[in-house]
Each structure stands twice: as structure tokens, then as C-alpha cells.
Amino acid sequence: MDGNVFPDQEQLLAFLKKLKEVFDVCDEDADGYIRVEHFVDLGLQFGQGDEVKKFAKYLDPNAHGRINFKDFCHGVFAIKGCEEILKSALGTPTIAAQPYQTDNGYYYQHQEGSLGPPIIVCTRPYPECQLYSDEEGMGGRDMQESDMDSAADSGAGSESSEGGRQDDKEEGLGGFFLRGNNCGQMVSSAAASVISVEEQFEDYGEGEDVDFTPSSPIPDDDTRTNGFSDLGSSLPSSAGQTPQKIRHLYNSELLDVYCSQCCKKVNLLNDLEARLKNLKANSPNRKISSTAFGRQLFHHSNFSSSQGSTEDLFRDSIDSCDVDITEKVSYLEKKISELENDSLANGDLKSKLKQENTQLVHRVHELEEQIKDQETRAEQCLEEELKRHREAYSKMERDKSTEIELLSNRVQQLEEENAEMKVNVCRLKSQTEKLDQEKQRMTDKLEDTSLRLKDEMDLYRKMMDKLWQNRHEFQKEREAMQELIEDLRRELEHLQLFKLETEKPGRGRTAAGLSEYNAKTREIELEHEVKRLKQENHKLRDQNDDLNGQILSLSLYEAKNLFACHTKAQSLAAEIDNASRDELVDALKEQEEINFRLRQYMDKIILAILDHNPSILEIKH
């Protein structure tokens, strides 16, 4: 932005359209107003409470409780610090109306509440001056605009379409807030604000002044073209407008009056400006351009003319126009003479600078010779340093080759030792594998022996149970035999008594009784023999039990020893990876001794089984 003028009306129009979309989203009832409570509720979803309340105060300064679109736009521009842009574009009456005067005697005037375009009044009462106002209708204005279009047809034809587009943009901006006749007021106010801001002159260096070339040799056209060329050259280019665009803005409905007599003085000013340009182009130290200087004079006259009221300016304009132009011409002639004197002084300065330049050239030549001498000495020193570095480098190469040879010999020796260690490791690995296999085989044998021992223990337990049963049966048989013997003894006594009784009455049955007595005696002897045999059997059984107990105790003792050796073998197997070769050999010998003892124990068990119960070794299906 430049000042208070938005650089592009299309951008302002697009921004207002976006604000309208936001306004429609917040307008929940679609009645053209936003309730402040609803707006605060929406704002609390995206910001803090204090900031939302301050924003609502900006949008509703009068605390009406609702916000229309105009207040919404003014609040947004006020928060962004750009409220003056909206006011200037919409013709808001914030600044008092002030007249503006140009060098050719025109006054630009826009007042508050004016419904038509601003009026330009000529200060010189010539009969060629024609005044048109809004009360006379559009007839005179159409004639005047046709004259201006014919004068600027060849040089500014393309800018006329841009002026039309600008008017359309301004009408679009006004249409956001006003309807009907108010739109015309907004357009005229916006155009007047553009003119008022464009007359704020700034110096941006030299620029090109583009003059119109008339398409026909009519005197009025020439004077009009020059007059508009002066207007275009006296406006700044910093606001994004070229002189042709500004002239087209003046050719639009902002210019209602044109004075051909006033342009004669303008032609004189243009000649003086041309002389100033030539002097400035030839001057070695240019400070300010002629166009910028003319702008400063125009701004000074504009500022001085804006101090009085509109009525005083109209009253004094006729008397002061000639005096002001004469003073300006004299002032410009004085400045031209001063610039010519400055040009002469600059010529003397130029000759002096040439002499100093000659002296400096000689000094440069001397310094170049000194530099050549220094370069020669530097090359000699460089050659000496290179020679010294080559010698040092050759010595380092020799030392390096010797060290590399020693290191290669050491590496070869280490490789041989490494190969020997690899062979030893392979051999030890093979021995370790063999020992592991032997250990596994002995472990399997020990497991088999343990299983067989378990079977023998089960068999012994069964035999003991069977022996106990036999003893119990024998005891029962013995008791039954004793009872039988007692019965036989009682029967024998009874028979003896019967025999005695029978002998007493007669001796006829003596032979039969004797034979019966002998049978009884033989029976008693047999009973005694059975009793004796049973006692011997009982003794043999006791001896068998004692022998079986001894065998069992011996087997348990041997099993304990074998289990202890097996545990030791397991611990040895756990340490076999960290043991040395001698330790492995000792462990192997100890394992072989354990295996030999285990074989002897197995042989003893087999012999004992063959002696006492060979049926155990029989294979049963």
C-alpha cells in the first residue's frame, strides 16, 4: 500500500468478498446481522476469552447487540490498522474537503455529501473556458469528453479501457455497502480520494516524461495535449500509475472544464524543464531531477493553496494566477543559472581529478614493479623450500619402507603360529568329540545298568514278598501239623487204653493188636521225621534270607559308588571345554577305570543271579 490508497482495487474487492463469506457463515438467521453472543461463542472455540471480547467490541462499538456487514468490515480494517483504506475507497467523510490547485490554474474540489463528480474551475476568465456542472445535464459533458477522447486518441487509447475497468472496480466496492443512487456517490468519492492521494509528491529519481503526439494539427488539440502531458509528468509514479494512466484518470469524468489559454504558461514551464533536463544530464553530480523538482514546486503550490477556504481561493484565483506563474518562471530561471555555475565548477573539479589520476597511475606503475621484485624473491624461496621438502620426503620414504618390511616379517611369523594353532585346535576338537562319544556310550551303559538294577530290586522285593507268604503258609501248615499230631497222640492213647481193656478179658486178639501197635509206632516215627525235616527247611530258609540280605547290601554299596562316579563324570563333562590337554587325558583315564569297575560289578550281579535264580535271565515273551 502507498499512503491510504489500496494498490489494486481488485484485491480490495476480493478481500471484501471473503469478508462477506465469513459474515454469511456467522449470520445464523440470514437476516443481515450477527448477534454478538453468537459471535463470542464461535470465537471461544478458536481463541481466548479476552481477545474474543475485545474483537467483539471493535465490531460493535456502540453495543447494539448485533453487527451488520458495514460495521463488520470497519472493525476488521480497524484491527488490521487499515481503516483509512476503506474510508478513502468508500468516500467516508472523515477528512474535511479541501481544494487542490495545479500549475495551470485548475482547482480540484470535492465536498462532503457531494453526489456528483468533483468540479474543476478555471481561474482565468477567458471566453474559451467552458464550465460544466451537474445541473446542466449530461449533454455538455458528453461533448467535452468527446473532445478529450479525440485529443488523446493516438497516445492514450489503450488506457481508456483501464479507466473503464477502474470505474467498474469502484462501483463494485460501493455495491457492497450502498444501493441505488448511493453507488454513484461512492464512485465519485473514491475517484476524488485517488486524486487527492496521487497529488502527494515524492522524489524517486529521474523518470521519463511521456508526452502525447497529436493525431491532427489542430491548435486546440496541441494545447490540450501539452496541458495533459504536464499533468501526467507532475504526478508520481510510486503509487503504481504511469503518466498515461494518470492522464486518462484526468480525461475521465473528473475533468469537466478545459482552458486552452492557461496551457500557454504550461508550455513555457515545459521548455524550462527541458533545459533543466539537459543541464542535469550533463552535470557529473546530479542531485534531483527536473521532474522531481517540478513536483516539489507543484506540491508547494498545492499545499499553500489548501490553507484557505474554498470561497477565498475562488476569489483570489483570478488575481494571483499570473503572479504565481511569473514568480515560478523567475525562480526556475534563477535555478537554471545556478545549475550552469555548478556545471562550470564541476568542469574545474574534473580537470583537477584528471591530474590526480595521472599521479595515481604513476604510483601504480611503481607499485607494480615492486610487486614483480617481490614475486621473484618469493619464487626463489619457494624453490628452496621445495628442495628441502623433497629431501625430507625421500628420507621418510626410506624409513617407511624399512618399517613396512619389518612389519611384513612379523605378520608372516604370526600367520605361521596361527596355522599351527588351528591344527592343534582341530586335533583337540577331534579328541573332544571322541571323549564325548565315549562318555555318551558309558552314560548309556550306566543307564541300562541302572534300569537292570531297578529290575533286580523289584524282583528282590517280589521274592521277599513271596518268601514272607511261604513262611506264613509254612507256619499255618506247622500249626495244622501240630494239631494233627495232637489228635493222633490222643487217638494213640485211646487205642492203648482200648488195647489194655481188650487184653484183660481174653488174649484172642493179641496178634491183631500188635500189628496195629507197630503201625502206630511207625506213624509216630514218621511224624518225628517230618518235624525234623521241617525244622531243617526252616533253617535253610533263614540262611537263604541272610545270603539275600548280604547280596542286596553289596549291590546297594556298588550302586552308590557307581552313581558317585557318574556325577563326577558329569561334572568333568561340564568342564571339558575349559580344560587343557593333560587334564583331558587324566579325565579319560579316570573314566576308563570307572568303566572297568562297572564291568566287574555287572559280572558279579550276573553270576549271583545265575547262582540263585537263573530264571531271571530267561527271555520271556
UniProtKB/Swiss-Prot annotation:
Residues forming the EF-hand domain are 14-49, 47-82
- Residues covered by region (Disordered): 132-172, 203-243
Where, in this chain's numbering, is Ca(2+) 1 bound? D27, D29, D31, Y33, H38
Q: Does the keyword Nucleotidyltransferase apply?
A: no
Q: Which SMART domains match?
A: EFh
Top-rank taxon: Eukaryota
Query: Which residue intervals are annotated with compositional bias (Low complexity) in the record?
Result: 151-161
Molecular function terms, GO-annotated: calcium ion binding; protein homodimerization activity; small GTPase binding
Localized where?
Recycling endosome membrane; Cleavage furrow; Midbody; Cytoplasmic vesicle
Q: Which InterPro entries match?
A: EF-hand-dom_pair, EF_hand_dom, FIP-RBD_C_sf, Rab-bd_FIP-RBD, Rab11-interacting_regulator
GO cellular component, as recorded? cleavage furrow; endocytic vesicle; endosome; midbody; recycling endosome membrane
One Pfam family linked to the record: Rab11-FIP3
Topologically, how does it sit relative to the membrane? Answer: Peripheral membrane protein
Q: Which residues form the FIP-RBD domain?
A: 558-620
Q: Which residues form a coiled coil?
A: 348-556
Biased composition (Polar residues) is annotated at: 225-243
Q: Where is the composition biased (Basic and acidic residues)?
A: 162-172
UniProt domain comment: The RBD-FIP domain mediates the interaction with Rab11 (rab11a or rab11b).
Role played = Acts as a regulator of endocytic traffic by participating in membrane delivery. Required for the abscission step in cytokinesis, possibly by acting as an 'address tag' delivering recycling endosome membranes to the cleavage furrow during late cytokinesis. May play a role in differentiation during retinal development.
Q: What is this protein called?
A: Rab11 family-interacting protein 4A
Native source species: Danio rerio (Zebrafish)
Source taxonomy lineage?
A: Eukaryota, Metazoa, Chordata, Craniata, Vertebrata
Gene of this entry: rab11fip4a
